[in-house]
Curated annotation (Swiss-Prot):
Protein name: Mannan endo-1,4-beta-mannosidase 2
Catalytic activity: Random hydrolysis of (1->4)-beta-D-mannosidic linkages in mannans, galactomannans and glucomannans
Localization terms from the record: Secreted
GO CC, any one term: extracellular region
The organism's place on the tree of life at top rank: Eukaryota
Alphabetic keyword roster: Glycosidase, Hydrolase, Secreted, Signal
PANTHER family: MANNAN ENDO-1,4-BETA-MANNOSIDASE 2, PTHR31451
Organism of origin: Solanum lycopersicum
Coiled coil: none
Enzyme class: hydrolase
């Protein structure tokens, strides 16, 4: 009799354990489904989140990983993300690269500093904590943090015959180094969140390069081939996240009449043909009228700015049929005659334009101001830095735009 009682007890315990495992599996499945539902998507020419239109106000803070690589400085990352979240900012663009040099993520081709990678892990986990989506860029066009010049130097060190930095786009060694970096980042297992980057909906999008330019071929054809190859490669690794190029918006040869809208020159890109590549999910533009039109008045610069935004919005809506983001803009404190009121007026005008364009179908998805910093980061000052806690009037303008875009997402007619 005792034997049968023990047998029944064992069976009952096994039954309870099986129920527990089933429940745990169900919870994990539900969590994975919830994460999948949290990915920002593209539906035609607008962004969606959980099946509803997604419009945003956001910011750039390129330095997040670099600072977070030193654990004693991570409070600066937390401070900026916390203040940004309080201001309603919901998207942040930052670097997922640092090639060679100080606090390098990639010390040499394929060799990574785990300490710096854990800094990026922290950035992603903090962004998740504060409800901020990330756009992560893979490489720089410029020499800051290594960029394409560092890849070219590495290839030369390996014996490649390279003429200049723009061979980055065509040399098979530099392309393979770059692909290896993409794979390393996309498949990275986050030591804090316990998720692989490619499975984390905190990341809104990948960016191929910060402001790609190619002085060796102004037509945009060389860059077009590179974008096609690299976009296909990214999507082969990760088909959950959105992908964008990182372009400033300069027009090329595909629509010659549009070249008159450029600020007097070309940079080897073609806004239309480059963004027509099907693996590219949305288009971007940048705008620095105080640099591009430095000799002109504030009024003239604003006229250019409005035309720049409107023409790209029209092309995104009618030709590309993809969303558009103003991914960098700002007003430098180093401009002659600068004061904070000038910057606040500039930002208010840009934000009104963004809102007005977004209201018409949601193609204009949002904007990212350059750039937010934390207290005590004077050594990062580039003229465009904004410390929200020290600039209440600017913070108020940013917060108002955040709330306006969030409210508009519930009203916009797609």
């Amino acid at each position: 009799m005792a034997y049968f009682q023990r047998l029944i007890s064992c069976i009952f315990v096994l039954f309870l354990l099986s129920l527990a495992f089933a429940c745990e599996a169900r919870v994990l499945l539900d969590e994975n489904n919830a994460n999948d539902q949290g990915f920002v998507r593209v539906n035609g020419a607008h962004f969606e989140l959980n099946g509803s239109p997604f419009l945003f106000n956001g910011f750039n803070s390129y330095w997040l990983m670099h600072v977070a690589a030193e654990p004693s400085e991570r409070y600066k990352v937390s401070e900026v993300l916390r203040e940004a979240s309080s201001a309603g900012l919901s998207v942040c663009r930052t670097w997922a690269f640092s090639d060679g040099g100080d606090r390098a993520l990639q010390i040499s081709p394929g060799v990574y500093d785990e300490r710096v990678f854990q800094g990026l892990d922290f950035v992603i986990s903090e962004a998740k904590k504060y409800g901020i989506r990330l756009i992560l860029s893979f490489v720089n066009n410029y020499n800051d943090f290594g960029g394409k010049a560092q890849y070219v130097q590495w290839a030369r060190n390996a014996g490649a015959q390279i003429n200049g930095d723009d061979d980055f786009y065509t040399n098979y060694i530099t392309k393979n180094y770059y692909k290896n970096h993409i794979k390393k980042v996309v498949t990275r297992f986050n030591t804090i969140t316990g998720m692989t980057y490619k499975d984390d909906s905190t990341i809104m999008a990948w960016e191929l390069m910060n402001e790609p330019r190619n002085q060796a071929d102004y037509s945009g054809n060389t860059l077009n081939a590179w974008v096609q190859e690299m976009a296909s490669f990214v999507k082969s690794l990760d088909n959950k996240h959105l992908l964008e190029i990182g372009m400033e918006g300069f027009y090329g040869d595909s629509v010659p009449e549009r070249k008159s809208i450029n600020p007097g020159y070309q940079v080897g890109t073609d806004f239309i043909s480059n963004h027509l590549i099907k693996e590219i999910d949305f288009a971007t533009i940048h705008a620095y009228t105080d640099q591009w039109l430095s000799g002109q008045s504030d009024d003239a610069q604003m006229i250019f700015m409005q035309k720049w935004m409107t023409s790209h919005w029209q092309d995104a809506k009618n030709i590309l049929k993809k969303p558009l983001v103003l991914a960098e803009f700002g007003k430098s404190s180093r401009d002659p005659g600068y004061n904070q009121n000038i910057r606040d007026t500039f930002m208010s005008t840009i934000y009104r334009n963004i809102y007005s364009l977004a209201k018409d179908g949601g193609t204009m998805g949002g904007s990212l101001i350059w750039q937010l910093v934390a207290q005590g980061m004077e050594n990062y000052e580039d003229g465009y830095c904004i410390e929200l806690g020290k600039n209440p009037s600017t913070a108020g303008i940013i917060t108002s735009q955040s709330h306006a875009m969030t409210a508009l997402a519930h009203l916009v007619k797609i």
